[in-house]
């Protein structure tokens, strides 16, 4: 069972083999101007992405839905969501960004005022600082608890969902709170409500998620089919991205502070975390030169894979130099630490400047 509230590392191939997700490589060549996350295999799987490709090529309306979980600090692994949203913005999407304050309350015990504060200071400011203009007309940011359209739709959708179904998907038990059990229905409504007549009617919707969120996607698609006659819903599409590895193993997570580089870290803190991170190097320089490194097991290389945008040629050069033993870990780590320090020096200034806009988006 995949646990959407856990933080265990998943075997991505199992998702493809056992849950009906298709390899993204099958559609990559059809994607107009694919992003580096697509080209590098970070986005590894999809459901029905052909619909999104068709909409982009024909210039037809489509929407993107991806939420913020305001229960902890925003870390560098979250940046890939912003990078995807910036790409979809360029491709003409209408973007919906629910702030999951109801889920944060029910699943993680975060009260609503804290959710609002975390959303503003960590996530909205972070998204703006990373280059996404959240005040554009085609981008909609909202709190779940304040969106009556989402809440009303969720109530209707819940009429065709029962406890046994939720138990089978999420492992709910008799001790699970009603609020926690209702949270997935709110999320289903987040994903489906862009297709309501009030917002333009049925259209393709893409939901970029990590593999641990696939239970939500499967439930959403099942419920969309049940309400097709009433609303005309098109089954939402989804893409699946690999988790950035944590500094201590597993996936990077806000709930495990030692695993993450946070966007609110100072440049010095971010640099120090990179310098102390595990590499894929051998035990001695002699072995490194003779056997080469293992970039697939290196958080330093992974940092570049996820965050060094632009051409892939420089990244390929680093990979090959590591594998053939001509690039030593010390040099690579030093270069990456400098890259991260510069990135965070610029980001810290942008985050501070973004706070007034972040407050304005939620508080008016």
From Swiss-Prot:
InterPro entries: aa-tRNA-synth_Ic, Rossmann-like_a/b/a_fold, Trp-tRNA-ligase, Tryptophan-tRNA-ligase_arc. Transmembrane segments: none annotated. The keyword Glycosyltransferase does not apply. GO terms for molecular function: ATP binding; tryptophan-tRNA ligase activity. It is an enzyme of class 6 (ligase). Belongs to the class-I aminoacyl-tRNA synthetase family. This is Tryptophan--tRNA ligase. NCBIfam families: PRK12285.1-2, PRK12285.1-3, trpS. Its main location: cytoplasm. One of its GO terms (biological process) is tryptophanyl-tRNA aminoacylation. It catalyses: tRNA(Trp) + L-tryptophan + ATP = L-tryptophyl-tRNA(Trp) + AMP + diphosphate + H(+). A motif ('HIGH' region) lies at residues 70-78. A motif ('KMSKS' region) lies at residues 251-255. One of its GO terms (cellular component) is cytoplasm. Its EC number is 6.1.1.2. CDD domains: TrpRS_core. It comes from the Archaea. Keywords: Aminoacyl-tRNA synthetase, ATP-binding, Cytoplasm, Ligase, Nucleotide-binding, Protein biosynthesis. It is found in: Cytoplasm. HAMAP family: Trp_tRNA_synth_A.
């Amino acid at each position: 069972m995949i646990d959407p509230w856990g933080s265990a590392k998943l075997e991505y191939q199992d998702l493809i083999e056992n849950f009906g997700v298709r390899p993204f490589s099958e559609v990559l060549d059809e994607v107009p101007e694919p992003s580096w996350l697509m080209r590098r295999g970070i986005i590894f799987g999809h459901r029905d992405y052909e619909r999104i490709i068709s909409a982009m090529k024909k210039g037809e309306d489509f929407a993107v839905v991806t939420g913020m979980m305001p229960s902890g600090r925003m870390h560098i692994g979250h940046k890939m969501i912003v990078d995807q949203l910036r790409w979809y913005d360029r491709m003409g999407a209408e973007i919906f960004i629910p702030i999951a304050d109801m889920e944060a309350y029910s699943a993680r015990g975060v009260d609503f005022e804290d959710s609002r504060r975390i959303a503003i200071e960590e996530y909205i400011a972070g998204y703006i600082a990373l280059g996404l203009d959240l005040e554009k007309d085609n981008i909609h940011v909202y709190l779940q608890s304040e969106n009556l359209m989402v809440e009303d739709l969720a109530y209707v959708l819940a009429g065709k969902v029962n406890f046994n179904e939720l138990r089978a998907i999420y492992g709910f038990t008799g001790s699970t709170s009603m609020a926690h059990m209702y949270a997935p229905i709110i999320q289903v409504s987040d994903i489906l409500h862009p297709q309501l007549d009030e917002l333009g009617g049925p259209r393709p919707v893409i939901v970029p998620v990590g593999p641990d969120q696939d239970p939500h996607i499967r439930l959403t698609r099942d419920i969309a089919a049940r309400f097709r006659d009433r609303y005309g819903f098109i089954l939402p599409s989804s893409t699946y991205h690999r988790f950035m590895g944590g500094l201590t193993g597993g996936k990077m997570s806000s709930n495990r502070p030692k695993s993450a580089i946070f966007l609110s870290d100072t440049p010095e803190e971010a640099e120090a975390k990179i310098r102390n991170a595990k590499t894929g190097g051998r035990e001695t320089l002699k072995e490194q030169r003779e056997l080469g490194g293992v970039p697939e097991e290196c958080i330093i290389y992974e940092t570049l894979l996820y965050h060094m945008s632009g051409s892939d040629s420089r990244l390929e050069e680093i990979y090959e130099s590591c594998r053939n033993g001509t690039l030593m870990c010390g040099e690579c780590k030093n270069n990456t630490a400098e890259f991260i320090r510069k990135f965070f020096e610029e980001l810290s200034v942008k985050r501070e400047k973004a706070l007034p806009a972040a407050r304005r988006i939620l508080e008016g």
